[in-house]
Every structure is written in structure tokens, then in C-alpha cells.
């Protein structure tokens, strides 16, 4: 029986806060850029709810416009996104899971070309990818998981979802009755409780094996 691990990408595998933060600091200065990162966190899901069919590239541009970025810089996040760094432990953790027989998939609130560029930085081949731009929906809507299970034929009892965002991933996956591993990089409080909590992806393969026997 195939075992599947699905992942969010940005914030879980790729340093989302670091990538966005650098762009905001360049556009608005170090002090204000740091303050605006929190506002950006609130704006992005709001824009996605307003138009679930919009591309992630457009979502980022609209968010920057609402923050007051110059018109010729509204594509700054999309331009920089392919250069955002993986978390240092991510490639090795994925390699270890894959070597242990896990099939890997990414469920991402982004566009196909942007995700493909990011995943080339991981050095690991993923077996499936589901992106918002192709299904017309953004997490926390369950459509990403619906599409993944339809494509892969995976057994839900042989699956776990791994992510850093409670709002976008852990809460909706838990509501679907799926096993979850929360990558709690910021030491936050969890509601709902994930099945497993890690501070990074280090030790992921061991946790997956223990969670899905």
C-alpha cells in the first residue's frame, strides 16, 4: 500500500515570511516593512476569498497595491518568489521521507509556474502537485485535498498532511479527518490540535512512520 505525505509549500518548505519580508523592506523601508508583514498576512486570504479564481500572481499584486506599493512594483513579489529559499533542513527531510518509501505531493495556494520554479530548489522529485490556479480555489477550502485524492487514488488511512499554517492547512485537513503534522516554527499555540507537532522538518520521516504505520 502506497503511503502519501502532502505538503504545503510556502511557509513549510520555502521561507515565505523571509521572502515577502525582504520585498516589503525594500519597498517600504526596514521598520515599516516589518510592520506591514502582519498586514500582508491578513490581506492575502481576504483577497483570495473575494475572488477564488484569481491567480496567485494577481493576489500578490493586489495586496501590494493595497499596502501602497508603487504601480510599477506591484509585481515585485511574483518576480522574487522563484528566488525564495527553502528552509535549511527541508531538502534532506524530504529525501529521507522519499527514501523511506513515502510518495510526496504539494498542495499550494499558488500558480503552476511559480510553484514549479520553487520546487526546483528542493532537489527532490514530487509525485503530485495541486495548485490553486488550476482548480479555481484557495485553501482553507477543501478543494486541494479533494483534487489530490481524486488524482492519486491515495488511501486516506495511508496519508498525512504536513504544513506550517493552522488556518490554511492544519485546521481544514483536521476537519476532513486527515492525519496532520504541524511544523510550528514560531512556537505558537495550536487550535485545533494536530496529530504531531514539530518545530522544523528535522525528524519528519520518523514522525511520518510513527503516525502512519
Language-model-derived ranges and their functions:
Residues 1-92, 100, 111-116:
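N-terminal helical cap/lid subdomain that shapes the substrate entry/recognition surface
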Residues 1-5, 17, 91, 95-98, ...:
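Asp-based, Mg2+/Mn2+-dependent phosphohydrolase catalytic module
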